[in-house]
Amino acid sequence: MRRGGTYIDATVGLGGHSYEIAKRLGAPGHLIGLDKDPAALEIAKAKLVVRRSSFVVGQDSSAGVSPATSDWPKITLLHRSFADLENDQRPFLACPELGEGTIDGLLADIGVSSLQLQDAARGFSFQADGPLDMRMDPHSERTAEQVVNHLDERELADVIYEFGEERRSRRIARAIVRSRPIRSTAHLAEVISAAARPMNFEPRRIHPATRTFQALRIFVNRELDDLKALLEAAPRILKPGGRVVVISFHSLEDRIVKDAFREGSIKDKYFRVLTKKPLMASEEEQDRNPRARSAKLRAAEKV
């Protein structure tokens, strides 16, 4: 990291990564945090408020800004998707000093957070009963309930297969259509479990509904499209020597990141790949944080 530089945490979440970046960044640095989830931004705000700085977390394209102090960077929190970095310039309207080629580093920790998984009312998990929602941004229109109850059988099977890599997608989709209407996570998990007998190659610890819930979440939130947009934006907004770091948690995400970095280094020649193989969590880290077992970190530098 370059002390006093400008960095983006594209998935600020609960503020853990942002806090560590801010500690190392210092003044007169600038940290911009983006997240779709306003509830997560409120938690991050509390974590990042130091030296009596104050925040007003921004809605839409407006910002919550903490001024820099002698040893703490300016911090701007935006309720925006990181896909907007490619789609338009709205995230930067609150940061007029920023523009193309001005960012020293960009971090994205892709996927659902522990906070979202543990809140039954958000509908991300089959571990507790809740409404079929699955929206990271509660202001977005499409919910998992709408997908489950309104897509036709073929479309639903395609979603489950493409985004969940679920080989039993057609059987599961057929069972879902026959069981409509489905309003809760528990009901959906029950339908999937009855339709999807475990395959011989699957570890017994994987619940039959795991891949289908993943597929619905990715589809509802357009996660892969957003990731592609972020990777397209990175070479435009980074300075020469600026770095993009992406942490992913399943093969679909990792494949997109790997391909984007490889294409950017070979075909377009605007990236230098820093991680020939993804970095994985140590055994110690996995013991502290079991979710880290599936995490893969890749990094590239703009040339």
Each language-model region and where it sits:
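S-adenosyl-L-methionine-dependent methyltransferase catalytic core, i.e., the SAM/SAH-binding region
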Residues: 1-51, 70-95, 99-303
